[in-house]
Amino acid sequence: MEEEDKVYFHEVSFIDKVGQLRTSKIPVVQELARQLKGLNHLPDKFKRVHPDHQLVTPSFALPIPTINMAKLRLVAEPQHKVRAQELAKLASVAKEWGMFLITDHGVPSNVLHGVKDVVKGFFGLPFEEKKASVGSYASVENMGYGRNFVKSEDQPLDWIDRLTMKAAPEGTSEGLHVWPQKPTNFRYFPQNTCMLLSW
């Protein structure tokens, strides 16, 4: 990521169609959104054309599907059928909807709110601080603050900046160099969430 005439960029690398390593500068979406306040259209690089895409009218007639995490954790012999049914439901819902609500996950609401607050705190930092608070994303794993899925100069881009981290088991340091140092309590809530969700 670098600054160029007060326009901020993520620097991404990819292999082009002829097998050459290329580097491209992609605008930082959060900063671009601040600059474009009052604009009523997206920059062309972020537009997608889907000529065969049908217009879908939003409907709230169907409830969002739910997956019961407690049922997925059942391992005792008499409860295999319940677990198998919930796994089948998960596969079906993921395929048909692409999203679902998880219930009975065991994570207290204060921990979930804490995660939300520290992530908002991170994305609320000035660009320079976000950039400085994570490791390099030149890694093969492409973790950290930046962009993902850039495969060519001319592809339409997603309207997103992302922060990707690995929740490594306690005692290892794999992937932990990309965990933000700011806000100072950033690590506490996601780490507790991971511990609560570990089976």
PLM features: residue spans?
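Peripheral, non-catalytic segments flanking oxidoreductase cores
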Residues: 1-199
